[in-house]
Amino acid sequence: MGVKERQERERQATARAILDAARDLFVAEGYSNVSIRKIAEKIEYSPAAIYSYFPSKDDIFLALSEEGFRLLLDSAEHCAGRADEARPPIDWIRAAFLNVFTFSKTHPEYYALMFVDRSVPRISRDWERFGFVREMRRQLTDRIQQAIDRGDFVAGSDPEVIFRVLMVASQGACMLRLCDRMAPGEDADALAHATIEAALTGLRIGFSHSYRPDSCL
């Protein structure tokens, strides 16, 4: 291995150590309570060394958030069968939202950073970097529109509203499990499936009033 290759590998290892330390601290103490100095102390680096890799704490979070959303995208593509165009849209939708719950179990630290701590920076501030997240959402709302067109949901339903309702259903089970709020003997997986199925059943009936959500992305 040449000198440049070794230096690059060492730099990548250091950046990884910074991100891992920051992720653990953000989850344990809350984003607003963590400083660059605290991250540096955890890995026994100087704050100046951290700044040579990431200009700010926000940049560290955005790097972690990008990793998390890419992990979510990868798992969604695997679980929902993105390449199976013959699959009914409603099955694809069900799998996609169940995958959010699975992701919260597989990567709880990333899930907490992405969806729980509201003191973190909004990813919309880095518009180009997170374009793939908007694309992921667009693909899902397109599938929802396909399901509406097939009659799986009430004609004229707003795909954005359906997206929000199903996200709330999946997030509820995620949060109860993550915050250790499950009832004694209650099964989180069963709750996630039941909640999403109940939401899908209700969406087939439709809404008695109109609602237009504001996009968070």
How would you name each of these model-derived features?
Residues 31, 153, 179-183:
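Conserved hydrophobic residue
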Residues 105-124, 175-179:
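Amphipathic alpha-helical segments used for helix-helix packing
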Residues 14-22, 39, 64-76, 140:
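Generic hydrophobic, amphipathic alpha-helix propensity
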Residues 102-106, 146, 166-185, 199-211:
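Amphipathic C-terminal alpha-helical segment
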Residues 17, 21, 25-59, 63:
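Helix-turn-helix
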Residues 63, 77-109, 159-166, 212-214:
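Hydrophobic alpha-helical connector segments
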Residues 1-13, 207-217:
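N-terminal intrinsically disordered/low-complexity leader segments
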Residues 70, 74-77, 124-150, 160-165, ...:
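Amphipathic alpha-helical packing segments from all-alpha helical-bundle domains
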